[in-house]
Amino acid sequence: MRRPPPLGPTTASGPEGNVRNLQKRQAPGPGAAGGCGPEAGGCRENKQKRRMVARATPGRGEVESDKSVAASGAGKAARRQVEGRRGPVSPSDSSDPRGLEAAKEAELPLQTERHTKEKRKVTEASSDDPQPGLDLVRKESLTSSESFQTVECLQSLGKESIIEGIKRRIRNKKLKSLENPPLKITENEATQNIKVEFQDELYKNTPKYSCNILSPEVENNSVLKLRDCNCFPHSKGCNDENNLPYKPDGGCMHVAENFSKKENLRSLAEKSDTNSIPQLLQTEENVMGVNKLLPEESDLYQSKTNGLLSCLQHEKNKYSIEESSVGRKPRKRMKLSEKADETVTEMNFSNEYNKSELMLQENQMIADGKEAETKSPLNVLRKVSHNTVSLMDHLLSVPETVEKETSSEHHVNAVFQKTIEPLLKEETENASEPLGYESMASKEDFKSMKSFIGKSPNEYHIERRSSREDLRSASEELKLSCQRTIPMTGKRTWPYYSCARISAWCWKKASLPESSYFLRGSQESCRQVDVPKHQTNQTHLTDSKLLLQSSLTETNTESSSKEKLDSNSNCLSSVSAVEPTLMVIKEPIIKDDKKIKSEELSRRGSEVISNTTEDTQLTSETQSLTGNKKKARGNLTKLNLTATSKDGQEANNSAGKTIHRKACIAQQTFIVPDLVKILNTGRLTNFKIPLLKNKSEKRKEVNAKSSEREAYSPLELLDNLSGADVRQNRSKENVSMMMLGPQTLSIRNSVTPVQASSDSFYNKKSYSISPSFTKQGNNSKPSNHVSEPGNIVSNKEVASLTVENNAFSCDPGYVEKSPSFCCNEQETFRPVSSEVRGRKITKNFSEVGFPDILKAYEDDVLLIDVIQDDPDLFGVSNEGELSFTSEVPKISQEPNVAGEHQSTDSKYMETPVKKEPSDDLRELPVLDCGWIKPDICASNSAESEIKRDPKDVNTSLGEVANETSENETLGDFSEQIKGSDLDEKHRFTDKVITKEEKENIYEVCKSKDSRNADFMVGECQFAVPVPKPLCLLVPPLNLSGRQEDTILNTWMNDFRFLGKHSVLKLQNPETCEIFKREKNVGVFQKSLGLMIPYKYCKFHFNTLRGCERPLCKFAHVPEQGDEKVCMDVFKKYININELCLLQRAVNIFMEYYRKFPPGVYFDLQVLNDLLNSLLKHCLLKEVFQIVNLSIMVKMLPSLKILLNIFEYVATMKLRNAVPALIDIFCKLVEAGMVLDPEHFNYIVKLLYQVQASKQEITAVLEMKSRLQMRRFKKNWKCDLDSALNKLEHCKEKGDWTKLGKLYINVKMGCEKFADFQTFCACIAETLTKNYEDERPDIPFCEFAETVSKDPQNSKVDKGVLGRIGISAMYFYHKLLQWSKGRKVLEKLYELKIHFTSLKGLIGPEKLASRCQIVNVAAEIFLKSGSLDGAIWVMRESEWIINTPLWPCDRLDVLNRHNLLCTIAHEILAKSLYRQTFEVLQNLPGFQNSQETVEVSQYSLLFNKLLGSCIESSSLGMSSSVAEFMISKSIPIDFSFLRRLITSLGRSRLWLKARAHYKSALSLGCYPPLEGNLYRKLLLIPSYLSEIEMLLAIEIFMVSNASSIQSPGTSTQILQIVLKRCEDNQSRSNDDYQAAVERLIMAARISDPKLFVKHMTVNVNKEQVYSLEHCSALKWLKENMKWAGKVWLFSNH
């Protein structure tokens, strides 16, 4: 986290060098990112500082205690070092405020002396303290918060070599002041000198933090009071026990450190007057930043105090610019680094002094501005310091007690605001001369003046002792100063747990210096440090100033928010006094800012905007410091946006500025991680915050309540500047908050200021959120959290600001490495920012104390409520926009960040109004510049956009603003842009997104580009120094060449690590799927107003973007029967006329009509309109698809559509489309489309224009000739009335052939099938009605013959003829004209028309069942004597009677039964047994169970058939009939069955005989076989035939097979008894004797033969026979296999 000592004066030996070294030594700690950046030789410098302090300060223990009070974390390290040098000093966190209270209780003279001493001590201690931020804060709260802030600022700036140079100067001055502990006058002079020097350095290093910088003494007392008032207010809102538990590291970057600072400030506040509490409330926002930059806060506070005093002095001594030169002298000693510091101080001061005006001047006179501005700001600071004494005396009446001083400081703040306004104006005018840096320096000087004014006279004297160093430190602290201050009470008192707590009060400038390492403050510091480096490298302070200004501007833009955060942290110790002053300063600045804003927008862009906007917003509301701070903050944000963009352009010209931007970007990235975490923590966007609706009013109210509401100030400023600016300011505030969290993580000290700044930005938007959010802002994580939901757009801007600031924060080391610290800074910056941008904060973040941020977030849980997706507060796409802001700022880096802030602000303003897919910009915002660029150019990848440059980011910001409120944002933002050079590029942004529909497309691109952009930004955004991104189709915001260069460098120096994504993964389109796919789909997509059934996907049908679910459970294609839904969807899509919707309509049309035919809801006009819309969008391929499908479904488009297609192809010279078009044309003509000759001629002409081939033209001509041949005259072809008249004419003449031709013509010419059906019905009626019986001809037959001869005859024609034939058949059946009816049926048979499945066209036959139609036809044949015809009709109908598919009435069934029976009798009479059996088999009741008919009634028919078959010896037919009867349980005559069995046996058909015998046996035809079978006894009736007797003997043998085949059974006898018939005893003798012969015959016909022996006659005179054993055994051996199966097993 540390940097090597800066080259040149930065590392110069001496008190300042020692101080720097001391600060460097203090920097190392848990929060290495803390107040001081890494510097080579940090230990040596620390030792030197120690020696310096030992030499300079007699009482270091006291100073040490003060320092410990000022910053717990940094103070611990500092105390350890000081204790090593001075002796053990007990750490004092909450106890430190006691010392402050004691100091307050002391009389003013004593306080003055004590302040002088403490200031000396603090100066020495600060040089000694390795962690000036923490120790100084503690000591400052106890002894001299000013010196602490100075040291703290130096610590935060310690990463910059310039800061240490400043510290050394401050030490020298403080040593001098210690040596000269005179009264207020001496102190004031020394303070002024120290302030001048310190501010010069601080302004150089931390232009935005300079406001917080106060001389140690001045800050000591007044800081206690002011902290109580300004810092404590923030601490009230933000300070909790968590505030004190800051990390011992000097890098107040950790939230804990911030908390500790806040707590220290609170303790100071508690010790100080209760009046300080309101000030504390006002400074709560600053306190957030102070919490983050608490160590820096003291320095920043000193800078503020110095700046305030300088402002007051300048106000009183406006004409005494000479003192400013005094401040410059130390700068000169500082060499380039000091010069850079001075430049930074000047920049800060000028920023404070002239925000907008300085911006304009910055572009013109950077070098001159540096010197002149430095002089003027320093002079002003000194004057203000002197004036501050008087003003302080005036306002405070030089209260004896510190509390009195505190209250007076409050008054001073108020008065100073009033006084500073003119001063700021004057200074602004003066600063306008120096252009860039002067404006910033003047602004920072004003901040310092504010802080000086806020300080007590004692502090003022102390400040005079170290006026120059103090001024520098004051400038830095002023920059680092937070609007929210944490008292040194040891508790975090955030009276208002609102996001707004951190709002505008966070001094962007003030917070930036200290947090410049890792936060916006870090960015500032980096800028300042970079500026000295650049100065060293470039030799020109002007160049460094330009770089610083651009960087600062960018940093001020993001830094402003960061500074607010930083200033909040600084306010912990110093803002108490500084903030009231800052408030005063900011009000005049607001006025000036609004004026200057336009100038600065054009000139300084981000630089002045950040400072001016901050001050302006803060100053906007003079009634309440918080409100003023908020306003100033909002204004600063706006101005910073503009200035930042412009500065970004200028920065492009200078590497240093680029580095600063990068640092800012890195810081922004840091902020973004917290915000991302917050965003990730719980879709904060879901929480709605009504604050934004009445943005200006609520903002004012919130500002009055807390600094966070300062965001509303931008709304007020919106009227003056532009809605876009205001939105940008808000976005900046949100961004600042976002940046705050991550920055705090990244850098403890610098991050803390940055957090304060971010809190400031956050507070600006926190108005939308809540005080708790502001509180969270100090915690860094809470503010990020708040920024995410509520301030998405703003957060994006904030992110950009953060990025810029982070660039500085990370860049310090890099800047030290090289003036064009693009690569080094990028490396240094990248560690901090790599995670920051994605959601991962780099090691710096972890070091920064991310857990503290988490803790702060936990403390500020209310942020969740604030982050709700309130369109008024955050815009519809707050999430995406937040991501965008964080990402984009990173990309755009400082200048772009400013532009982005503006865009984001305006976008934010508008975003609340817009809740459409365009809100998906949220996703793109995630992508950084890449995201923005997608807005600008959807086709361009985010990666390319990222490569483009911060310009692209600016453009994207502009786009964002445009998207958010295209009109409002574009107008306002354009105005700002016009005021600055940004206008043109922002216009491009405006152009990029002009419509919500385009936003939709933009979202699509955004999702794609955003991924690329995010990836690029995360991995390569700043890693690769690329020129302006080529992807930027539209020119980016007009940035000065320097800014543009810087932007490019910033991209090159991206704080992120290559290959890593920024913390804001929510911004990644895929990550945003959480919000977009699931959430945005329902929340962000606007309904098209269609009434879609529940089963269909509402997103697919009813939204512009459609369904984005990978697997959707709802249908995307209408189902059969929902054709009306299709038509409604098509109509809606056609009305909207969006490309994506039309393509979706094509898909739906194709998928639906491929499956289902057109129905009653099909509207041909909708088809034509859809084709027209597709043609207008040049979707020729889709047109062809739909036309081809419409031809398939027989729904042809209109002729006009066809001609339009030809015209389009000819106009566009689409030669390749001609073959497909000709093919479609031929299909349409063949399908029935009618074209006139002139149409063909026109088509041929168009084909010649498109240079169609001769073959293609010939094809068209051939279709023309074919069409002419097929059609009749045009007057009647398609005219139904004419055709009907023709039909009547044919009827009258009986010219049925002509009627057939008329039918053919109508069929070819009629376009509507309904008309054709009507015409056919008329034909059927004509052929059936009013027909004379005398005429022998059959009209239907002649008509059908003519139609059938048509070569175009098709199935349709056959169907029509069949239906007309049925009508004719019914007609003749009704008239009992069987012969004519038979002729009709024969004609149908001849034409192979299956009429049985058709229905008639008219009359009852139109509703007749199929059974009825068949019955009528069969009856006609039967009546006409054609049995074959009747059977043909039955067979044609498949004998169907009643089926589910063809239901019929019972009457139809009865008619069928009678008809079939009649046919059977007639056929049987003709001995057609097979046909008869077929007819009988199809009687009702045999086909299905639905025919509830008793089949037993058919017994007579079947027995008659069976008998006839047996008599005719049709054994096969007889057997089939018998089997059917047995199977259907139809009663069978046993005599026929026995006869059948005998006949079959005698015919040697044994198989069938045995089967029927067995069936007959089961039916009871034969007496049952008793158990005698097993007793070797067989009883055979005498009436059986020989066949039946043989079958009985076979059963007997098979049944006794086991005993017959056993070896020992040969002696057994098988007896056969021939039973007599009792009924015929009279004839029994003859019949019985015949039976005996049949028995013997049966034995003989057996195979093998059986032998039967007569044994005896029984009592009944029945012959008894025995079956020879050997023959039976032989028969079984040969036949047992089949016999066993036949006789032993049942067939069923």
UniProtKB/Swiss-Prot annotation:
Protein name: Protein TOPAZ1
UniProt-annotated location(s): Cytoplasm, Cytosol
One Gene Ontology cellular component annotation held by this UniProt entry: cytosol
Coiled coil spans: none
Compositional bias ranges of the Gly residues kind: 31-40
Presence of keyword Transcription: no
Alphabetical GO biological process terms: apoptotic process; ectopic germ cell programmed cell death; lncRNA transcription; spermatocyte division
Cited InterPro entries: TOPAZ1, TOPAZ1_dom
Annotated S-S bridges: none
Protein's gene: TOPAZ1
Cytoplasm in keyword set: yes
Role played: Important for normal spermatogenesis and male fertility. Specifically required for progression to the post-meiotic stages of spermatocyte development. Seems to be necessary for normal expression levels of a number of testis-expressed gene transcripts, although its role in this process is unclear.
First-listed, main subcellular location of the protein, grouped into a coarse class: cytoplasm
Chain spans, region Disordered: 1-135, 600-629, 894-919
Transmembrane segments: none
Biased composition (Polar residues): 608-627
Pfam families in UniProt: Asp_Glu_race_2 (PF14669)
Keywords: Cytoplasm, Differentiation, Spermatogenesis
Basic and acidic residues compositional bias, start-end: 95-116, 902-919
